[in-house]
A protein has these predicted regions:
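N-terminal cationic and glycine-rich segments that engage phosphates or anionic surfaces
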Residues: 1-103, 108-437
């Protein structure tokens, strides 16, 4: 990995791209500390220090914003609206024929879907910004903080609208920065910003665990977190690289006087075909009842049950629900993102076949069978990766705000591997260009 970056810095074109990407990252991190008008930041700092290590319902969104959410800054929403919009459009592509047709139109269709994603991102940013401001005004953003109600001292409508506009504009700027990295830098822009956002929360989260620890001044908890985190990174790297290669052969065809085909290749089916999406889906779904209960009035029985069972990450009901939702969404997302019938039809169209399997419907059935078999261990792996941090700290009685959580590790390792692959492919391409000259 370090060798690839060193070689990239020795190549002028890649060095410019890497420096441009680093410059955008600096701009993004500066934006996460720019305050918005109408917020009492002394009260915010007091509540953040009191809530350190226990971010509650907003922990996931705060992680994706690089800690900017609980600071209520311009980039408070981070890239979460874009992630949500991308997932929604990906799901709608399967349901709405018009979007499915656009997806098959190539570059023009992809550009149109990207435009829809931008519009939906802005709409979601307005909704999420309004919800965040309303939560901060009511004092529910930092429940239990003594000065939570004074975070937004001015309750005027104009102040609320100004705050929402600032956060929505910040989301649009983040989206633009991500697209700049994609076009002129290295790697996928949104993935890089996601990587940076998560990595930025690691030092404070680790230090919070050390401060809250009780064994040897917190150093035992601190060391155990580092050890478990390294083991998880190694496991994630191993599984993310694992794939089942389905062999494919292409028959020879004579077109004019030339012979085409006759080659052998394979279809790479990853063990974790769904990626990190099931974990995000499951986390978001579990936040909904807890969020409703937090804003609901009165002391009804259902509200008390949700508060006790679905807001604490170490509660058995929460753990079981989280695990089952991850397994379900892993199968669900694989089913909508990989179409065996479409793959089988494309293979048949170009004269490809799987040895021992007839072309057409039998090929589609075989691919579905293989995919279901490898999705089972993939879904169980996702569930375990998401729950291991919580289970590791239950014995120590430390905070469940584990910095090496399943979502963060999956994203960091996935983005890191993909970025290194892209750098190596560009280095290889430039080597070939030098050879051809």
């Amino acid at each position: 990995m370090l060798t690839a970056f060193a070689r990239a810095f020795r190549t002028p074109d890649l060095r410019k791209k890497l420096l441009f990407t680093l410059g955008i990252i600096v701009v993004y991190r500066v934006g996460t500390h720019i305050p918005i008008p109408g917020v009492n930041y002394k009260a915010v700092q007091t509540c953040v220090s009191e809530a350190s290590g226990n971010q509650g319902l907003f922990g996931l969104v705060n992680m994706f914003s690089g800690g900017a959410l609980l600071q209520i800054t311009v980039f408070a929403l981070g890239i979460m609206p874009y992630i949500t919009a991308s997932i929604i459009l990906q799901l709608l592509t399967v349901v709405i024929p018009r979007l499915e047709a656009l997806k098959k139109e190539g570059q023009a269709g992809t550009a149109k879907i990207t435009q829809y994603t931008r519009y939906l991102t802005v709409a979601l940013a307005i909704l999420q910004g309004t919800g965040l401001v309303a939560t901060a005004r009511s004092g529910a953003l930092f429940s239990g903080c003594t000065v939570a109600s004074s975070i937004v001292p001015d309750q005027a409508i104009f102040t609320t609208i100004t705050m929402v506009i600032c956060m929505t504009a910040g989301t649009a700027v983040v989206m633009w920065l991500g697209e700049l990295i994609t076009d002129r830098g290295i790697g996928n822009g949104m993935s890089i910003l996601m990587f940076i956002s998560i990595a930025a929360t690691f030092p404070s989260a680790l230090w919070a665990i050390k401060k809250q620890g009780t064994l040897a001044g917190g150093w035992i908890e601190f060391g155990s977190v580092i050890a478990v985190g390294l083991v998880m990174v190694a496991l994630v790297v191993f599984v993310e690289q694992a794939q089942r290669r389905v062999p494919v052969q292409y028959a020879k065809r004579m077109i004019g006087r030339r012979s085409y085909g006759g080659t052998s290749t394979y279809i790479p089916l990853k063990v974790n075909q769904a990626g990190v999406i099931p974990v995000i889906f499951a986390s978001s779904l579990l936040y909904i009842p807890a969020l409703v209960a937090q804003f609901a009035g009165g002391n009804s029985g259902w509200k008390e049950w949700i508060t006790q069972n679905l807001t604490k990450g170490d509660h058995p009901i929460y753990i079981v629900s989280y695990f089952l939702l991850i397994v379900f969404f892993a199968f669900f997302y694989v089913a909508i993102s990989f179409n065996p019938e479409e793959v089988a039809d494309n293979m048949k169209k170009y004269g490809g076949f799987i040895p021992g399997i007839r072309a057409g419907r039998p090929t589609a059935e075989y691919l579905s069978y293989v995919l279901n078999r490898i999705t089972w261990p993939g879904s169980l792996y996702l569930g375990l990766i998401a729950l291991v941090p919580t289970m590791a700290l239950v014995g120590f009685g430390a905070s469940n705000n584990f910095p090496f959580g399943g979502t963060s590790i999956l994203i960091i390792v996935g983005v890191g591997l993909e970025t290194v692959k892209q750098i190596e492919s560009q280095l290889q391409q430039r080597n070939y260009e030098g050879f051809l000259r």
